[in-house]
Regions:
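Bacterial Sec signal peptide processing site at the extreme N-terminus
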Residues: 24-49
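Short, intrinsically disordered, charge-biased short linear motifs at domain edges
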Residues: 15-16, 37-43, 63-65
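Active-site-adjacent substructure of cysteine-protease-like catalytic cores
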Residues: 124-158
């Protein structure tokens, strides 16, 4: 082998070796015509450790509204071994439609968020109890913001939840899309919910972030911190 070819191989494989020392980096679907399946995913041990700790602590107990489901796997690093299907929050008092598929550590945070942020905001601004959340998205194996070549979304790990509408006992409802720039009451409710959500999730994104989030609040427990 010539010295030129030897040096060329070093240049090609050295970056890959560096990636392997910091964690497995997977490129998935680079030739796919579907941008959702064209993403970069990194094997991060903390995810498995966090899930195991949640399960060992019995932080989530199956009920009529929180049920265990079969493992979600692939492609690439999508999924979780011990997902739960959540159809209501805060002890069953607030329904979630459609149901959400989430990993174990998300469930207690959603419960606390509903009980400690959304329900108090509903009583304060709406004067009626919260009864239902409209789930725009939970588990979905896709790239961030549906952009080809982006990182795997936290939705791909069942580690994110999107909420588009809040419904109340008096029959009224506030959608994120219509209410963010809606009446004073709607704006006040949604902004109090948005700001409070940042205490419970690492990343919270709404209409103020970009057009992709104009109609929902995104909340996740990923490694990046943002409240926008």
């Amino acid at each position: 082998m010539s010295s030129y070819m030897y040096l060329r191989r070093i240049r090609v494989f050295a970056p890959l070796a560096a990636l392997m020392t910091s964690g497995l980096l997977l490129l998935w679907g680079c030739s796919s015509s579907n941008p959702d399946l064209d993403f970069v995913a990194k094997d991060e041990p903390w995810r498995k450790q966090e899930e195991n700790a949640c399960l060992s602590a019995n932080a989530v107990r199956p009920t009529s509204f929180i049920q265990t489901r079969s493992a979600l796997g692939g492609p690439s690093l999508c999924g979780t071994e011990h997902p739960f299907e959540m159809s209501a929050a805060d002890g069953g008092r607030v329904s979630m439609k459609p149901t959400a598929l989430l990993r174990c550590p998300m469930i207690p945070q959603v419960d606390r968020w509903v009980a400690e942020v959304v329900e108090p905001a509903a009583r304060h601004h709406i004067g009626a109890p919260l009864t239902e959340l409209t789930v725009a998205a939970s588990y979905a194996c896709r790239s961030m913001n549906h952009v080809a070549g982006a990182r795997l979304s936290e939705h791909g790990y069942a580690n994110a939840l999107d909420i588009s509408v809040f419904k109340f006992a008096d029959g009224s409802a506030i959608s994120v899309k219509g209410g963010w720039y809606g009446s004073g009451r709607e704006r006040a409710f949604l902004r109090e919910v948005h700001d409070g959500t940042c205490r419970y999730f690492t990343t919270v994104l709404g209409p103020g972030y970009n057009a992709a989030h104009r109609d929902h609040l995104h909340l996740d427990r990923g490694p990046y911190r943002a409240c926008r």
